[in-house]
């Protein structure tokens, strides 16, 4: 009987190993992604403040809502929330920790008299959120002023606007010979969007593209980068000050990922340099909040590959489209917002006439 048990266990093991061997590379990749999501769950936090601006010496009263990225449900993963008050020099001026109970936390930040007036940033995160990029931390800019004294105010001389700008090539990289869209975001030292315009030049100072910030310091332009070139952005601000910034280096070899949103589909376009057109597999995975909703394998047997994914397979939200090479290494990524206009429509009716400050009854429909 003992021998029979060993034989059965061996058979189960062999069957399991056989199943593993029959897995496609894409199936293995999806299992790896699922394991990462389970091992390092994502959380999101949103904070409500009691008002939009403050004075030195006051308290910032806040309430935080911590949810799972996967289902937007109250998170039970973290019991501590970290909240930082950061000045416009990126220096942390105050740090507090809040106890989280069933996804809810509340508290206050005392604004010491030693604080200078200006724009500050509220940043909130949990230990789990540290497993991912800090771009996923909650951030909000607030204005903090100081009480004016009775002294005669001195005339403040005009200062040049200090700002920074970041460039985001579509898919992550500029690749020689492949036309690409490049997004940009420009912010002032106060964290506000910078109103600017400019153009792109190559190393011979030849103009190859122009751009203008369209909203909150953000915009987009198209460029056909060439290998062995270095591109520079010449930027002009509203005060006519001019600065130059280097664009990311151009790669000689690589795959570029472009995703366009049409009425019904996400249109996927994979462009490859000639040296990579060898018939090897690449994998495309589309997920929302860590859940994979679509995936496929394609062979790079030509310079441009296209495919469509129906938008109806995704819930409303940000779709992360990732491109992996034959070794399951991520090589490009795009984020696209899918909106099915299925948000809750709530009408609020005040059932009592508000004459003075008092408790009021609201009807939600």
Locations of the language-model features?
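Bacterial Sec-dependent N-terminal signal peptides
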Residues: 1-30, 364
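A structural signal for beta-strand and strand-to-loop patches characteristic of beta-rich domains
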Residues: 24-365
């Amino acid at each position: 009987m003992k021998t029979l048990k060993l034989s059965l266990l061996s058979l189960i093991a062999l069957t399991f190993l056989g199943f593993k061997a029959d897995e496609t590379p894409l199936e293995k990749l999806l299992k790896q992604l699922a394991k990462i999501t389970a091992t390092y769950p994502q959380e999101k936090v949103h904070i409500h403040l009691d008002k939009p601006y403050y004075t030195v010496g006051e308290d910032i009263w806040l309430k935080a809502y911590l949810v799972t990225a996967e289902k937007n449900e109250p998170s039970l993963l973290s019991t501590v929330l970290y909240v930082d008050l950061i000045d416009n020099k990126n220096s942390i001026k105050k740090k507090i920790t809040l106890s989280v109970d069933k996804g809810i936390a509340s508290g206050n930040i005392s604004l010491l008299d030693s604080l200078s007036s200006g724009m500050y940033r509220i940043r909130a995160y949990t230990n789990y959120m540290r497993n991912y990029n800090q771009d996923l931390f909650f951030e909000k800019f607030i204005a903090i002023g100081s009480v004016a004294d009775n002294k005669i105010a001195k005339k403040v001389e005009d200062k040049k606007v200090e700002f920074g700008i970041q460039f985001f090539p579509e898919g992550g990289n500029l690749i020689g010979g492949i036309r690409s869209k490049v997004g940009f975001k420009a912010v002032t030292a106060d964290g506000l969007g910078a109103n600017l315009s400019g153009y792109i030049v190559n190393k011979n100072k030849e103009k190859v593209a122009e751009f203008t910030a369209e909203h909150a310091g953000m915009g987009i332009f198209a460029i056909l980068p060439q290998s062995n070139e270095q591109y520079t952005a010449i930027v002009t601000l509203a005060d006519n000050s001019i600065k130059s910034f280097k664009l990311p280096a151009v790669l000689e070899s690589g795959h570029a990922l472009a995703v366009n949103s049409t009425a019904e589909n996400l249109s996927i376009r994979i462009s490859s340099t000639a040296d990579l057109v060898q018939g090897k597999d690449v994998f495309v995975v589309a997920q929302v909040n860590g859940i994979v909703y679509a995936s496929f394998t394609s062979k790079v047997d030509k310079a441009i590959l296209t495919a469509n994914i129906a938008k109806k397979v995704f819930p409303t939200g940000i779709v992360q489209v990732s491109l992996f090479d034959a070794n399951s290494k991520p090589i490009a990524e795009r984020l696209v917002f899918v909106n099915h206009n299925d948000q809750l429509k709530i009408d609020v009716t005040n059932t009592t006439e508000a004459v003075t400050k008092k408790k009021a009854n609201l009807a939600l429909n």
